[in-house]
């Protein structure tokens, strides 16, 4: 092994171990990083690689760009996973959310995938019949982009259990849609007569003291603002 220096390369470590060329240990004599003899890969054997500054990450700038279009960034600067609480809401309404409410999310870069279930758990009050129903509580604000890359992305929606039905069989939602610059989803269905996609309304919810009602399962992927 040798330690050298050149004006161009700076400090040079040259290892010649039978197993590893470079081994870094902590004060407890635990190996935390190593490079195999003759190898070029760096292995972190204990702990994690921690980005100490927000917005920094792994830069894939050495890779080729797209075959069509133009790349704007090759920096992977975020990963996160966790839970969130989706709840029904409608302007002016008081809605008691049910016991079958919960969700999970995963964020890779600015791409967010959420899944969840939500329901109502009691009688509702206030509200206006024609006002849209929302699922609120998204973990990240939807990107406010109007150029096409994030124009109201849609996801899957299912009301699996008929025992927890909605008020009108024909108006049960089948799609969730993210809304630019917001932290909620809209629900919608295809009208049986006109075939148009219509936002689910407050009067589409089944008003019942039973728990749960209006049970729904959903997932959606969208681009986050940050």
Question: What is the predicted role of each segment?
Answer:
Residues 94, 118-180, 186-187:
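Terminal beta-strand-rich extracellular "head" domains
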Residues 1-7, 12-17, 21-28, 32-46, ...:
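Beta-strand-rich, repetitive solenoid scaffolds
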Residues 1-8, 21-26, 41, 83-100, ...:
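Short, solvent-exposed secondary-structure boundary motifs
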Residues 1-3, 65-75, 83-108, 117-146, ...:
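Surface-exposed ligand/attachment interfaces on beta-rich extracellular proteins
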Residues 211-226:
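Short, structured beta-strand segments at or near domain termini in extracellular proteins/domains
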Residues 55, 109, 215-219:
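Extracellular structured ligand-interaction cores
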Residues 175-209:
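Short, surface-exposed beta-strand/turn "edge" patches of beta-sheet domains
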Residues 114, 136, 216-220:
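Hydrophobic residues positioned within well-ordered beta-strands of beta-sheet architectures
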């Amino acid at each position: 092994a040798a330690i050298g220096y050149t004006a161009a390369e700076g400090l040079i470590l040259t290892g010649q171990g039978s197993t590893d060329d470079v081994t870094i240990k902590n004060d407890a004599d635990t190996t935390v990083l190593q490079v195999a003899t003759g190898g070029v890969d760096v292995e972190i054997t204990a702990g994690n690689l921690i980005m100490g500054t927000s917005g920094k990450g792994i830069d894939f700038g050495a890779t080729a760009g797209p075959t069509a279009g133009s790349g704007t960034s090759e920096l992977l600067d975020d990963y996160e996973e966790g839970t969130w609480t989706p709840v029904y809401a409608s302007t002016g309404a008081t809605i008691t959310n049910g016991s079958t409410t919960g969700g999970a999310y995963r964020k890779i870069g600015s791409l967010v995938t959420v899944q969840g279930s939500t329901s109502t758990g009691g009688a509702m009050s206030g509200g206006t019949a024609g006002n849209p129903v929302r699922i609120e509580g998204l973990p990240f604000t939807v990107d406010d982009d109007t150029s096409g890359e994030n124009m109201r992305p849609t996801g899957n929606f299912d009301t699996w259990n008929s025992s927890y039905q909605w008020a009108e069989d024909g108006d049960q939602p089948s799609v969730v849609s993210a809304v630019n610059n917001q932290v909620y989803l809209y629900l919608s269905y295809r009208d049986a007569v006109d075939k148009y996609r219509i936002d689910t309304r407050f009067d589409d919810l089944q008003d019942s003291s039973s728990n749960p009602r209006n049970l729904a399962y959903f997932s959606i992927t969208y681009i986050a603002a940050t």
